[in-house]
Amino acid sequence: MAGGEAGVTLGQPHLSRQDLTTLDVTKLTPLSHEVISRQATINIGTIGHVAHGKSTVVKAISGVHTVRFKNELERNITIKLGYANAKIYKLDDPSCPRPECYRSCGSSTPDEFPTDIPGTKGNFKLVRHVSFVDCPGHDILMATMLNGAAVMDAALLLIAGNESCPQPQTSEHLAAIEIMKLKHILILQNKIDLVKESQAKEQYEQILAFVQGTVAEGAPIIPISAQLKYNIEVVCEYIVKKIPVPPRDFTSEPRLIVIRSFDVNKPGCEVDDLKGGVAGGSILKGVLKVGQEIEVRPGIVSKDSEGKLMCKPIFSKIVSLFAEHNDLQYAAPGGLIGVGTKIDPTLCRADRMVGQVLGAVGALPEIFTELEISYFLLRRLLGVRTEGDKKAAKVQKLSKNEVLMVNIGPLSTGGRVSAVKADLGKIVLTNPVCTEVGEKIALSRRVEKHWRLIGWGQIRRGVTIKPTVDDD
C-alpha cells in the first residue's frame, strides 16, 4: 500500500489487482479471477486417525508445513488447527494427458506459468484456490477437530495403507463430518509405498466395507504416497472435478467465525510500533473490506455483582486483510483470512478470541446463555478401541445436571443439562455464545477422562442476553 492510492493492492504485482473503488460485490463469484488470485474460496479439511499422514498430505499439495509450534514438531503431531493454502493449476494444452495436466503450488505463485513438461506447450492456468484445514487426529484433541469441521466445505479422509481399517479416530471423525452434513469426501489411501499390492487391495476392500452406509459411500479412493508425492496430481484433479465450489453469498452483511487469533507484536516492541490483534477465520457470507468498522461478539465476558454473565462487544476497524502472505483489499467467503484490527492485542493473544463472531456493526446474531435443543444421540461410543469382537459401549441417555461439551460452530464451551425430554434438552452454557436458531451443535461427554462425541443437536430457541454498550 505504501506510496500508492488508497484502496488498491500494490503488493505482489504478479497477482491480480484488487481495487476497492471499482468493487461491485454483486458481480463476484467464488471463481472470480481477482478473488482466487489472492485468496482461497473453498475449505477442505483433512481428517483421519493419528499418524495416518494428514499434515504430510497438506504439505505435499501446498508446500506448507502446517505444524507450526515447537511442541508439535517435537512430538510430530498436530495440536492446534493447521492451515495452508494451495493453488491448483491446469495445463491448457489438450494433448497433455490427465492427471499430469494438473499441478498444485503455494498461494503466492503467479496465476499463470509456462509448462515444464517435455513435449507439451502452453501455460499452467489457475483453476482453484483451496484452503486446507488440518485437523488433529488424537482422540484427546477431538474438540479441536470439531471446531475445524465448522468451516469445512469438503474433506479428505486419510487412511494409512499399513494399518487395518478403520482405526478408532477414523470412525469418530467420519461421524463428526456426517453431523456437519459434509457431502463431498475424497478417501486417500496413504503410505502405499510401504505395502505390497495384495495388502493394498485387501485394505481397499476393508475401506469399501467401512464406508458403506455412511456419507462417504461412493467416494473415490485414491492410492497415494504423501512422502514420495506419488499420485498427488490425481488428488488435485479430483479436487477440481469432484468437489464443487459451494455457492457463496457476497451481498449480505459480512460475518466471519474466528478459529485462530494472535498478538503479532514481539516482546520489547516500542509503544508507537504496537500493532492491533489479528483474528484468523473463515468468512461465512458477505465481503470484508479494509477500513471497515467491525463488531466482535460476544466480546469481553464478565460477571456482574450478582454473578450474572455480561457481554461487552468489541468495536474496531479493519486495518489489513491477509490470505497467508497475500495482502487483500477485500476478502470473500471461503478460505482462511487473517484480519488485522485495532483491537487491544492482549485480547487476541494465544487464540483467546476463538469462537467469537466478527462482522459488520449491528448485523451480528444474538448472544445466547441457555439453549433449547432437539438432539439425537449416537447408538454406540465411537473412537474407543474395543478388544476383539466386543461391541463398543452404548451411549447412555442425557441426564439432568450432567456437564457436556458443546461445540457450536468453532466454539467449544461447557454446558450443564438443566432439563431433558425424549428428544429435547435445555443446556445452560458456561460461556455465552453468539449464534442463531437452527444452527447445528455437536455434543461430547467425558468418558474415561476423554471427551467423546455422543450426539448432535439443533438450536430450537434459547435465552439471550443484551450486550452492554458503554455510553461514553
Curated annotation (Swiss-Prot):
Source organism, top-level taxon: Eukaryota
Chain's gene name: EIF2S3
Modified residues (N-acetylalanine): A2
InterPro entries: EFTu-like_2 (IPR004161), eIF2G (IPR050543), eIF2g_C (IPR015256), eIF2g_dom_2 (IPR044127), eIF2g_GTP-bd (IPR044128), P-loop_NTPase (IPR027417), T_Tr_GTP-bd_dom (IPR000795), Transl_B-barrel_sf (IPR009000)
Family listed: Belongs to the TRAFAC class translation factor GTPase superfamily. Classic translation factor GTPase family. EIF2G subfamily.
Organism whose genome encodes this protein: Pongo abelii
Catalysed conversion reaction: GTP + H2O = GDP + phosphate + H(+)
Subunit structure: Eukaryotic translation initiation factor 2 eIF2 is a heterotrimeric complex composed of an alpha (EIF2S1), a beta (EIF2S2) and a gamma (EIF2S3) chain. eIF2 is member of the 43S pre-initiation complex (43S PIC). Interacts (via C-terminus) with CDC123; the interaction is direct.
Name of the protein in question: Eukaryotic translation initiation factor 2 subunit 3
Pfam families: eIF2_C, GTP_EFTU, GTP_EFTU_D2
Signal peptide residue numbers: none
NCBIfam families tied to this protein: PRK04000.1 (NF003077)
Region G4, residue ranges: 190-193
